[in-house]
């Protein structure tokens, strides 16, 4: 049976979450009507994902829905925000009901996990792409930003950057991993990244700055450096690698992927010396490793990478949509 735009929305995307009392009116009218809780600041982020650019054209729709939402959740995590609402503008080449069912089921599984509600959006015909607008709340005056780092702050990352780039390389047959368990782990790190929502919330009163690693550590830490007007010194020997990555990738390639591979969606953040003990307590029970990799400083500009005690020059760069190939 043919499925028009409005029946498509009703069948696959109009799923009300009654637990969200801040939504007066969701899908079905010209606008959503929403209430911002008292003493909360609204945090908003938007991402566009295009087939062949941000994801492989033959990706499983369940993985696509998960990743599309997860990367937006990662932006909220970087600000220390609580997830609340989502808008979705979806462009489809045709109506494939099996594809839509898999996509929407996966999307709502993750929405429900974070007690979020889809409040509106749009559908149209064209090459496969989507734009998501995510909304969350952060207590007034407690949001994490890129601009708060101070000289002397210690620089940390969660998880093990570089895994996502390795997973993509496996999917593109650029990396051969014979161990099925390791291959599955790395592919999952690319297709289904874990937004560090709890870590971001725990950092509200501990970190001076934070950012999520979407374009690679070089690029993203560079944003903190620029916004905070101070330098950063990184000890390459301190960068954490997963066992799966270390077993199948040469050290220099692992380092390159960790610094410039992108799409890890871990958090990079800076913490003053005074808060390091509290940081261990706040993040230590959340089940995700976090590693100190360097220090912010006033005596250099930009990023300085140290190997065996000496500065080294790296010509790697993070991902840039408009960079000249």
Curated annotation (Swiss-Prot):
GO terms for biological process: thiamine biosynthetic process; thiamine diphosphate biosynthetic process. Substrate binds at residues 54, 263, 319. Mg(2+) 4 binds at residues 30, 45, 75. It holds the Pfam family AIRS. Keywords: ATP-binding, Kinase, Magnesium, Metal-binding, Nucleotide-binding, Thiamine biosynthesis, Transferase. Optimum pH is about 8.0. One of its GO terms (molecular function) is thiamine-phosphate kinase activity. Mg(2+) 5 binds at residue 215. Mg(2+) 3 binds at residues 30, 75, 212. The keyword ATP-binding applies. ATP binds at residues 121-122, 146, 214. Mg(2+) 1 binds at residues 46-47, 122. Reaction mechanism of ThiL seems to utilize a direct, inline transfer of the gamma-phosphate of ATP to TMP rather than a phosphorylated enzyme intermediate. Catalyzes the ATP-dependent phosphorylation of thiamine-monophosphate (TMP) to form thiamine-pyrophosphate (TPP), the active form of vitamin B1. Cannot use thiamine as substrate. Is highly specific for ATP as phosphate donor. This is Thiamine-monophosphate kinase. The gene is thiL.
């Amino acid at each position: 049976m043919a499925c028009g735009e409005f029946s498509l929305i009703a069948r696959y995307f109009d799923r009300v979450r009654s637990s969200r009392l801040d939504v007066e009116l969701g899908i079905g009218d010209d606008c959503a009507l929403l209430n911002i809780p008292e003493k909360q600041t609204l945090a908003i982020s938007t991402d566009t994902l295009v087939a062949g650019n941000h994801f492989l054209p033959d990706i499983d729709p369940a993985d696509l829905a998960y990743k599309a939402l997860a990367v937006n959740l990662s932006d909220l995590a970087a600000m220390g925000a609580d997830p609340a609402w989502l808008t979705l503008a979806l462009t489809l080449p045709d109506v494939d009901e099996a594809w839509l069912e898999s996509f929407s089921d996966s999307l709502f599984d993750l929405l429900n996990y974070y007690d979020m509600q889809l409040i509106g959006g749009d559908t149209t015909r064209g090459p496969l792409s989507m734009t998501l607008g995510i909304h969350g709340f952060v207590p007034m005056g407690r949001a994490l930003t890129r601009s708060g780092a101070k000289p002397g702050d210690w620089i940390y990352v969660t998880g093990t950057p570089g895994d996502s780039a390795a997973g993509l390389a496996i999917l593109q047959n650029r990396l051969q991993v014979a161990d099925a368990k390791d291959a599955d782990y790395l592919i999952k790190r690319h297709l289904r990244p874990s937004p560090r929502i709890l870590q971001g919330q725990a950092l509200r009163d501990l970190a001076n700055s934070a950012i999520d690693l979407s374009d690679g550590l070089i690029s993203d830490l560079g944003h903190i450096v620029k916004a905070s007007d101070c330098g950063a010194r990184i000890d390459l020997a301190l960068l954490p690698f997963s066992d799966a990555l270390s077993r199948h990738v040469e050290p220099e390639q692992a380092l390159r992927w960790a610094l410039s591979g992108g799409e890890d969606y871990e958090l990079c953040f800076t913490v003053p010396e005074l808060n390091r003990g509290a940081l261990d307590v706040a993040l230590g029970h959340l089940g995700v490793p976090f590693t100190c990799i360097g220090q912010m400083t006033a005596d250099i500009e930009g990023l300085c990478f140290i190997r065996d005690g000496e500065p080294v020059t790296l010509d790697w760069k993070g991902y840039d949509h408009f960079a000249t190939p």
